[in-house]
Every structure is written in structure tokens, then in C-alpha cells.
Amino acid sequence: GEGINGTIAGVYESIIKFESHLLSLGFADHNPKYSYSKIMPFFRLKVRDKKEIVTLRSKNVDPENITGKKIKPKYWNNLISDKKTILIDLRNNFEVEMGTFKNSLNPNTKSFTDFKSYLKNNLKKAKDKKIAMFCTGGIRCEKMSSYMRKKGFKDVNQLDGGILNYLEKTSQDNSLWNGECFVFDNRVSVKNELKDGTYDLCHACGYPVSQDMLKSKKYQKGISCINCYGKISESKKQSLKDRRKQISIAK
């Protein structure tokens, strides 16, 4: 298997105890990242057994033995400021639209698997170029850098610990990050220095909603946003309205 990827939230003492328990089980390459939230990021426990931590659908990867060079946040700015560096955002299009590094390429993908086609169609002549890639927490980079190395790319670099590690370790004054970073919990997004972001989440389609989008007539809290308005069936819309009522009563 590829290992375990997980996120938990709780008070400091509980997190430390849990981490100690994990280490006692003998897991290798323990690489935790910490941040703080004013709200509980998760409402329930969710455990999934998957064939791949992030789905690439390729046997041509071996992240345990071959990946790109991991670049610490303190060295990242120098790398991506080099005009010879090709900087690639590995995340999906909606994530890139929320925020990214200046001058990065947006592959316009809807899923991680799509990046293979982008690579074939757009970067096949860049195998001797200096490549720098980044993603939210570093996992997508682990797989894609391995895939690219196997495909003959010689100088592949990846942001160690991903965007979240960079935002945590880099002061806002020195940051080359623009915008916000989508996170897969109730915070929805974070900004420089991992401060809480401004995005909300459409509970009908799971799409992040900016403050400007909240002003749209197509936005109804918990029912629709500009991404899914007109695409939701009446039965689904009614069930969402019923859910909103239940949440309101529970509060």
C-alpha cells in the first residue's frame, strides 16, 4: 500500500497523545503539519480504504524510491524566481482560481488523473528543463514527480510539505503566494501564515464560494451557488431545504 494520509483536530494535549500512539505503532516517515482553527474543522470521523491515496491510475510511479528533489520553504522563493524554472500548480482548476504562486502554470485539470494528458500535450519538450511543482500538502507532488522522473524528466523539484507548509513557515512580507489555499475541511480556505480564509462552501455541490459569489442571486445558503444553480433536481433541492431547516432547529 501507499501508506496513510489523515487529518484530525482537537485540543493540543489530545493531538500529542494521538501522535505518540501512531509512533508507537511503528509508522515510518511520520511527517506531521500543524495549524490552528477557530472552528472545529470536522463534524464526523471518516475512514476510507483506497487503492491510491490520490488517484493517478498509473503503474509508472514509485514514490518510495524515486521522486523529485524536496525544496524547503526557505529555499522555494529563490527557485521559483529563477526565470529558467517552469513552475507548475498540480491542483485542480477551482483550487488554482482561489490562489497560487505568481507565474505558475495552470494545467486546467478537473482531476489529478488529467495531469498525465497535460504533461504529454504541453511539456514533452521540457524534459531537460528545471521543473518546480507544488500542491496543497505535498502528496500529489510525491506521485507526479515520481511519474515525471520515470518519464525522463531530469530536474524535477517539489515544494516540501506543500503550500500549507510554505504558508506556515513563510512570513506574509516574504511570501510569493497570492490569494487563498483551499483546504479539505470546514475552514474551506487559509491565507498567508495559515490565517483563516474568506471562502464559504456550497453544501449542494461542494464548490468554494467567494465573498463576491455570496452576493449572487444564484446563491442560496446550503441550496445552490453559481457553480450548481440550475443543475440540481427539484427533489435534491427540497432535501437540501429540509436539511437547512433541521440544522436551524438543532441550533
Located regions from the model:
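Rhodanese-like catalytic fold shared by cysteine-dependent sulfurtransferases
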Residues: 1-67, 92-131, 139-251
